[in-house]
Amino acid sequence: MGLFDFFRGTNINDGIQQFRDTEGALLIDVRGDGEFRQGHIPGSANIPLQRLKDIKKYANKDTPLFLYCLSGARSGRAVNTLVGMGYKAVTNIGGIASYKGEIER
């Protein structure tokens, strides 16, 4: 996947590997707080879709961002929002519902 992946081009498991291989990248779960507490991918930060403006506390506009939600729909909307805010390296990796790895609670 390249920059500005508005639509999921790979599955979340491949996206997690790409995140791990990208120096300085952030993994962001855009689901709500309650969903995040029920289970999330280890190492991810929770910045719900409605609070995306808070991203500036964690990342500059060149930081590689890898976003996920439950199905990939909200993370797709989040990619559009962040690109509109000037972020340059934003990738929608899809939904945690398809994730095969460890879940942190």
Model regions and ranges:
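Rhodanese-like catalytic fold shared by cysteine-dependent sulfurtransferases
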Residues: 2-18, 22-26, 33-64, 73-105
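Short, surface-exposed ligand- or partner-binding patches at beta-edge/loop junctions that are enriched
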Residues: 68
